[in-house]
Amino acid sequence: MLGASVTVPSACSVLSLDVGRKRIGLAGCDPLGITVSPLPALHRGRFDNDLLVLRHHCQTRSVQGLVVGLPLDAAGQPTAQAEHCRRYGVRLAQSLGLPLAWVNEHSSTWAAGERHGLQGDRTGRLDSAAAALLLEQWLQDGPALKPAQSMAAGTGAEPIDGGS
């Protein structure tokens, strides 16, 4: 379920994540929020190993916030994977000391596959293309980044702003 009021975010360098069980699609934008670029997908390992790679991306790109996709169903309700994504996003944001925002990623992988001809891709290119779509969506619709601590108590059932 999407929130009624949307606050369009201030432009800043952001890292977008499409969190999956095997890979995390990654995309970033320039500090003005004009150019969105897919980045090489991260093949999942232990959280500490993921954190090293993601911290490096954040430092080299001067990232000021994270956007994490939440897979909601067609009715806007959280899926089982949404809770995994929420926990991962909060843990990552807290570890990096960055604010974050959630974006409804319903159909983002399908849309990315259609847009870029990547249906069935297993290399991670599709995951990162989906992360780029999430970031484009966030830049247009918000919501504003919030401290991870304010999201830590989330159950995955509360509404999120932005998204389609």
Swiss-Prot record:
Main location: cytoplasm
An example Gene Ontology CC term for this record: cytosol
Origin: domain of life: Bacteria
Pfam families according to UniProt: RuvX
Cellular location(s): Cytoplasm
UniProtKB keywords: Cytoplasm, Hydrolase, Nuclease, Ribosome biogenesis
EC code(s) of this entry: 3.1.-.-
GO molecular function, one term: nuclease activity
Single GO BP term: rRNA 5'-end processing
Stored HAMAP family: Nuclease_YqgF
Role according to the record: Could be a nuclease involved in processing of the 5'-end of pre-16S rRNA.
Family affiliation: Belongs to the YqgF nuclease family.
Protein name, as recorded: Putative pre-16S rRNA nuclease
The organism of origin for this protein: Synechococcus sp. (strain CC9902)
